[in-house]
């Protein structure tokens, strides 16, 4: 396999299918453009699927989990043991994403890339341990090169499994105490913004905690001397196993021809890494929502993304993306099942 597979070409959009979808939209029994963004979504999905009338019956959700060494710096309101506990909750069916996946009839895969518990073995979890969490990036690089490449590959492999199952839409979620700190550090590097403008409460830090979090990030960025034009170095130095896996998954989706629905702040950081590594993948990314973390809007702006929802979410897990799936499905159903003017014998122009 190509050792820099993430640079391989992405699938092109089917412009003929998009033209057919646009033509159909003009014939549906409604004023042109009256369904707003739903029309654009249907046309975009037509281009992604290569058909005039797309559908999203097959949705695959993968949760990537990993712990973060930077938690040693006191940047989280929760202990790292929660990561492993939540893995049990995911496969036990009690987490928000578990409930949403059931309601959507979506597949749910949970991948452990490295929690702090080296003995964690849970039925239903795919354990691909790369270490007992990342190293503390406030003192040294978060990942070795081998760990970074393995995490990217883990994301790719998850997509290949989803593709074999016929997935039409991929949602990546994440779990890892401390991962908003890693995401903010990455965002600060890639966007060239001060960490204090991008750092938020995560799982519930108070004002002093957020300030400390930003200070830890700023010191780490000075330590590593990161550059915005080297996203791979930044990912390895201050990222996380799950963030790297998400980036790898998004790139693989674009190469395999599977649409992606990107979740919140952490997933959007991974999306920006993916786009910086291979700009062609951007066309395959849809963005579910604008979350409550202060850095999320800056990321969406950098990605020129129009989020579908704004509900003040900051849970992660892929939950915001799952919430947006019914909207995408309804866009497809309206596009595919509304009558045309000719079928309904309705005048197609004003008097």
Curated annotation (Swiss-Prot):
Enzyme class label: transferase
Family according to the record: Belongs to the CobT family.
Matches recorded under InterPro entries: Nict_dMeBzImd_PRibTrfase, Nict_dMeBzImd_PRibTrfase_bact, Nict_dMeBzImd_PRibTrfase_N, Nict_dMeBzImd_PRibTrfase_sf
Protein name: Nicotinate-nucleotide--dimethylbenzimidazole phosphoribosyltransferase
An annotated Gene Ontology molecular function: nicotinate-nucleotide-dimethylbenzimidazole phosphoribosyltransferase activity
SUPFAM superfamilies: Nicotinate mononucleotide:5,6-dimethylbenzimidazole phosphoribosyltransferase (CobT)
Function: Catalyzes the synthesis of alpha-ribazole-5'-phosphate from nicotinate mononucleotide (NAMN) and 5,6-dimethylbenzimidazole (DMB).
The species this protein was found in: Pseudomonas putida (strain W619)
Domain of life of the organism encoding this protein: Bacteria
